[in-house]
Amino acid sequence: MADNKQRRILVVDDIEDWRTTLSGLLLDEGYKVEVADSPASALALLDTYTFDLALLDVRLIESEDGNTEGLTLASKIREIRPGVKIVLITGYDTPEMVRQAREPDANGLILAEDFIPKYKTASLLQIIEEVLAQE
């Protein structure tokens, strides 16, 4: 846990309960955590802090079926902060969404180091540790 105190994680989810739950888990493990409820607030935090990892909900506008604002945000983060590791989380995973997140784009970039359905959050801390250990 000592190393975690130096790691800063950005949690982005439009649902307050999820932001609270995810940030609470990470804070309990000793991570520094900042939370955002939208792509705009996430980008503002990226201008303020240096993050090791961003944990992004894929569907950042809950009221819009098929919304994938989190994928768009992941792409922007890759562009402006290429060193930030990205883990996507969602309650609405589809094979197409997973493919978009994990396969290289036209420039050879992969949007996310990992993709976690929200019903598998028990493995979240282990996945984050593994992703942060990647060089």
Outline where the language-model segments fall.
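Non-catalytic signal-transmission and effector/linker regions of two-component phosphorelay proteins
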Residues: 1-10, 16, 40, 119-135
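A generic structural signal for alpha->beta connector loops
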Residues: 6, 30-32, 83, 109-112
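Acidic, metal-coordinating helix/loop segments flanking the phosphotransfer/catalytic sites
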Residues: 10, 23, 34-53, 61
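Two-component/phosphorelay signaling modules centered on CheY-like receiver
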Residues: 16-34
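Conserved phosphotransfer cores of two-component systems
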Residues: 47-49, 76-84
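Alpha4 helix (beta4-alpha4-beta5 surface) of REC/receiver domains from two-component response regulators
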Residues: 68, 72, 76, 92-117, ...
